[in-house]
Amino acid sequence: MIVRTLEQARQSDRRVKADNWESVRMLLKDDNMGFSFHITTLYANKETPIHYQNHLESVYCISGEGEVETVADGEVHAIKPGTLYVLDKHDKHLLRAFSEMTVACVFNPPLNGKETHDENGVYPLEAETIME
């Protein structure tokens, strides 16, 4: 059984920071669950271009407000607490946080832990592994 708290993970290498967000990676590839689970905070008034070419992701909004825009068709969807969006087609998208947003994210295949977006908004398929 795996038991860890958000605070424990936040105080460890499982907390990864970037310019527009920070993510606490609660479950990772080495946990052998077949997916990774993250609690991510998106900073207010920021836009993040993302294109997960190697991963599928589901995102559930816990707090805050923003929107997600699919680049291919310009369709915009509001995000508020209780909203789930799923990137099931490796959708290139723009994620905008109007206020600080906290979201729960599930990735398949799972992340190793140290991933941040490259210049194209992509996470690498294999990145540095967090060692505990």
From Swiss-Prot:
The record's listing under InterPro entries reads: Ectoine_synth, RmlC-like_jellyroll, RmlC_Cupin_sf
What Pfam families does this protein's entry cite? Answer: Ectoine_synth (PF06339)
Which top-level group of life is the source organism from? Bacteria
* Free-text function comment from the UniProt entry: Catalyzes the circularization of gamma-N-acetyl-alpha,gamma-diaminobutyric acid (ADABA) to ectoine (1,4,5,6-tetrahydro-2-methyl-4-pyrimidine carboxylic acid), which is an excellent osmoprotectant.
Q: Which UniProt keywords apply?
A: Lyase
> Which pathway is this protein assigned to?
Amine and polyamine biosynthesis; ectoine biosynthesis; L-ectoine from L-aspartate 4-semialdehyde: step 3/3
What sort of enzyme, by top EC class, is this? lyase
Its name, as the record gives it, is L-ectoine synthase
Q: Which Gene Ontology terms cover its molecular function? A: ectoine synthase activity
Q: What parts of the sequence cross the membrane? A: none
Question: Which GO BP terms sit in this record?
Answer: ectoine biosynthetic process
Q: Sorted alphabetically, which CDD domains does this protein's record hold?
A: cupin_EctC
SUPFAM superfamilies on file: RmlC-like cupins
Enzyme Commission number(s) from the entry: 4.2.1.108
What is this enzyme's catalytic activity, as reactions?
(2S)-4-acetamido-2-aminobutanoate = L-ectoine + H2O
Per the record, the similarity remark reads: Belongs to the ectoine synthase family.
